[in-house]
């Protein structure tokens, strides 16, 4: 589109379009024309590709045909949902003038901008997931990061000190839209994300940010929020708030404060740990078989979102954890009575956000009324519970009898979707509205009587009175009887099998009906806006109630999970260490067809590191992950899958397990593994829980072994972290002889001929064999390949037994001689745990070619 400069050469309507488009050059403009939203020029081309809609041409303007695409106004939400999922933003431009009185084009203006991070419409949002808008800032002192959930008003800021912490924050919050300054240097950190928005530098000005935030919260300064000195975070928050005001074009009364999130308040997890533990997303990007999938049976969407926030930010505040544990304990006998009432409360949090933005639909108000009707039952059910924390939450749930009464009087039982459809305000609420409705209804009755009268008077049995949007009211007579109509019948429309007529009397009543309907609808819209004015003064109390109800839902849900899944209440101790009796993996035990074998775990200052050996598929990774998940669950206040657990102070959880090539960044598996390892060695403390699985496997035998040895030594002697160290390097099993606090444990298996039975039970001491060939046989590797491998194994073991030194078991073919076969090096570097059956088979053929 080259013609924006020469506006005069365009038609008046296109001039209007181009002026509006110039104000929103970067985003799609949906331009309302009658029953359609139209897009023109490049917008039309882009939308036709993204939405798979027809690209046509509309006449010509400035001598050029105009590319055009359009969507019907009644289906616009579906198209917006698709665009938002693709990370696009859309400006909605409506007709605000009256076509009947307009000279020239009807007046239009952009009434809202829909962006991925600022949506509140039910149709566009994922119900059980937070939808965050975020802004990021970086300077020499570090990062500033702000997030806002506009559908709840939750506004958070943080100041990650380094790029690893910033990456972990992005992974945790997973914003739908991210604002960044045009000078942002670390593009590699964000460039893979959807919904990126480059913003001018002035939007991040610290003074402007302070003014914006103080104005929003009605405060003099930000000291009360604890963010006055958070200079980087405030820059991000200021840009974010400005963007929301620009896109929403209305006040934001539900955003009432800002909270600083400090890493030290919770258990810190880096991006790799969050991914590996599969908290809310599995390694394939789906949501099945995750911790959230097992733990989340919340009956409200707002409760589900709160639980996921807890999982991603476990707290270290012992008082909070004890409160939650006691509440869960006291709700175990009540959850079955409480959950049905909570389910009826629905997603009050998001309804209130739409109320605050004055975009609530009639059905939102009906749902709010329904939520208010549940509150007396919830109060009655919980008032006898003696746990102080449950009473504290209950005291935050208000009783809104007046508002309930207002909505019961004002809104019909089952309102239509939109106010413009009419019929939202209940009869008897407003006398003027009732009068106009009676007029409209009376006129309708009159038309029924007119039809009967004319049919009988003229003796035309096919005569009927009808209405359509183009021609208004008409009298229809079949073609066969049309020659019998009297002369004062004026033909209005001819159809294939009928003729339509108008008579003066009908025209008069048409005007009366349309006038009374239009008047009734105008009054109804005014009364609907008035309802917002009556509800909004109570917004603060309503939001507090919604938050308390969401938390009661999470706690009742965790009480149900604890009872159903046989979880025990962990003891949160201030003594260092982790002791678990009969621990189980919360996800694996639910997907296994056979009973899960529970296992103990003991870590203490005298027993800091477990060297874990045993066969592939023996359960090493499961054992390690279940430990991390039990510790994490204990730190959200939940009961845990064990018969007993005592959890001491934990500041961070690190996992270095099963890396894959990071093709996007051009990093090999080994490079990914070493980067994660470096992060652990730099940041772990004696209170950290560290899971190290098969360190050093992506390089040659000696490199890998030396790295694994040095890492284990460093973690055990310098850092003194609580470490689970799984390895196939059996040389590492000699570490306990050389260092205090290091202990061998193994997972056992029984071999019989070519078959193997994994015991999945953890025993003290080192494993005696790796059982790699038995696992290959299980994976379906052909018998002749297994046979040849056994033969080769015996040869290699013979070589190994001549050259082996120290206490290394000859059967482990550690091959300390210099003349190592490439096949053996490849075998050593291979991690069978991470192979699919097909990959295992490919490797066997590759190894055969090497030998």
From Swiss-Prot:
PROSITE patterns: DNA_MISMATCH_REPAIR_2. The keyword NAD does not apply. ATP binds at residues 614-621. It holds the Pfam family MutS_II. GO terms for molecular function: ATP binding; ATP-dependent DNA damage sensor activity; damaged DNA binding; mismatched DNA binding. One of its GO terms (biological process) is mismatch repair. One of its GO terms (cellular component) is cytosol. CDD domains: ABC_MutS1 (cd03284). It comes from the Bacteria. Keywords: ATP-binding, DNA damage, DNA repair, DNA-binding, Nucleotide-binding. Gene3D superfamilies: 1.10.1420.10, 6.10.140.430, DNA repair protein MutS, domain I, MutS, connector domain, P-loop containing nucleotide triphosphate hydrolases. This protein is involved in the repair of mismatches in DNA. It is possible that it carries out the mismatch recognition step. This protein has a weak ATPase activity. Belongs to the DNA mismatch repair MutS family. This is DNA mismatch repair protein MutS. The lineage of its organism: Bacteria, Pseudomonadati, Pseudomonadota, Gammaproteobacteria, Enterobacterales. The gene is mutS.
